């Protein structure tokens, strides 16, 4: 197994004074990336259905999300190709934000009817392609230029920003669609990628970053040759189960108990807000000090949350707004901590190599695949074992994440953790 020296990465690291603007830029980019996801996965299926689009056509809407899984196959191109005039990351950020802006403006002028359903799905797919490709460039930017505490803060912005963007593009759009109408709503949301384009234009990428290309072209196969990549891939596959598995089944559990769709929606909104406001900042704070300890704390907090849901399903606790809020609080605080700590680890690994965008994208693609699989597995387990046994079994399964995390720590080279300071990698 080979690992890449981090010496060539020393020059592109952002100076502390420039970290603030860079973090603002990165947060805005992650926020804008979440908006098309919320629109495609949550808002537009509802809007199109209300306008009479048949379910047979709506079944194809989730295909718009495929770029987020498949982006690993063109991630090396994002690392390898850019305009010398614009800069390595700036080239892709400007191009993809412009493409996203065009897609959103086009959607504003295409009525959500059955006749336009296929066209809308195609336009949404273009928007998702832009956001997924931009994500590779944004991750590469953060991994190459940020270190220590700034890196953990960037990952808090990643998790919280994308969740916030998803909520604005999803639930936020549904709240405003009746008041503003489709055209004005989409034009209003289009101001967000327009604002990020302005931020990218204001940021001048240091030309020193361009010398990374002299280390050789980025290749997907090179990811698999790095020391410690296989246990890290396993961790990436598993850690998303905490949030995706928990949140996908809790709403079904409440609906089966007679809660309304609106009530379940409020619980989901509460969970998202908790992850943004409490979970992600807590994860950033822990990751910047004791990353491995933070990951362990996050897993145990999630286990408490899932255990609380299990007690609700058993009838040991009454199911009311207070107990549901407490269970949601634990689950999403823990999920936020895990996500930020794991993402910080992934970016540290990517930033220590020669192809940060490709390496981080591979880990993210595996993570998304794991989330999708676990979201279905927990539903299957609930049908087989019942809600209470399923919740408690998944809670105990959190220990597997800790076992794999210890394996990752033992297999990674010291160079892979150099972007983090010594304290952050402590026990």
Which residues does each predicted region cover?
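C-terminal transmembrane helical hairpin of 12-TM major facilitator-type secondary transporters
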Residues: 293-342
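Intracellular juxtamembrane helix-capping segments at the cytosolic ends
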Residues: 132-146, 337-351
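Juxtamembrane intracellular "pre-TM" segments in multi-pass secondary transporters
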Residues: 7-19, 205-233, 427
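C-terminal ends and interior cores of transmembrane alpha-helices
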Residues: 93-114, 301-318
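Glycine-rich segments within core transmembrane alpha-helices of 12-TM secondary carriers
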Residues: 71, 152-171, 364-375
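Helix-to-loop junctions at the C-terminal end of transmembrane segments
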Residues: 70-87, 278-293, 382
């Amino acid at each position: 197994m080979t690992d890449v020296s981090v010496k060539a990465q020393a020059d592109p690291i952002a100076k502390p004074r420039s970290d603030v603007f860079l973090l603002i830029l990165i947060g805005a980019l992650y926020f804008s990336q979440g908006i098309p996801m919320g629109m495609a996965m949550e808002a537009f299926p509802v809007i199109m259905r209300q306008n009479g689009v048949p379910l047979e056509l709506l079944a194809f809407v989730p295909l718009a999300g495929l770029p987020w899984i498949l982006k690993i196959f063109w991630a090396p191109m994002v690392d390898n190709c850019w305009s010398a005039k614009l800069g390595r990351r700036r080239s892709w950020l400007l191009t993809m934000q412009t493409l996203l802006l065009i897609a959103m403006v086009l959607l504003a002028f295409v009525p959500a009817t059955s006749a336009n359903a296929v066209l809308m799905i195609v336009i949404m797919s273009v928007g998702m392609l832009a956001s997924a490709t931009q994500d590779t460039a944004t991750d590469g930017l953060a991994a190459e230029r940020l270190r220590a505490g700034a890196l953990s803060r960037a990952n808090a912005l990643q998790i919280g920003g994308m969740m916030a963007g998803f909520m604005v593009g999803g639930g936020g759009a549904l709240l405003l669609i009746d008041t503003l109408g489709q055209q004005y709503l989409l034009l209003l949301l289009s101001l967000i990628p327009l604002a990020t384009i302005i931020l990218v234009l204001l940021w001048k990428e240091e030309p020193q970053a361009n010398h990374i290309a002299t280390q050789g072209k980025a290749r997907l196969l090179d990811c698999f040759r790095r020391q410690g990549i296989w246990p890290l891939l396993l961790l990436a596959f598993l850690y998303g189960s905490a949030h995706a598995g928990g949140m996908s089944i809790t709403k079904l559990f409440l609906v089966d108990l007679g809660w309304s769709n609106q009530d379940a929606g409020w619980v989901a909104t509460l969970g998202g807000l908790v992850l943004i406001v409490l979970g992600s900042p807590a994860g950033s704070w822990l990751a910047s000090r004791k990353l491995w300890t933070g990951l362990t704390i996050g897993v145990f907090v999630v286990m408490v949350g899932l255990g609380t849901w299990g007690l609700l399903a058993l009838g040991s606790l009454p199911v009311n707004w207070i107990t549901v809020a407490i269970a949601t609080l634990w689950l999403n605080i823990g999920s936020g901590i895990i996500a930020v700590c794991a993402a910080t680890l992934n970016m540290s690994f990517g930033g220590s190599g020669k192809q940060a965008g490709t390496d981080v994208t591979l880990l993210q693609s595996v993570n998304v695949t794991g989330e999708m699989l676990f979201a279905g597995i927990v539903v299957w387990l609930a049908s087989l074992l019942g809600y209470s046994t399923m919740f408690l079994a998944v809670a105990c399964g959190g220990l597997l994440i800790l076992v794999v995390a210890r394996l990752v720590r033992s297999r990674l080279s010291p160079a892979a953790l150099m972007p983090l300071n010594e304290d952050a990698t402590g026990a």
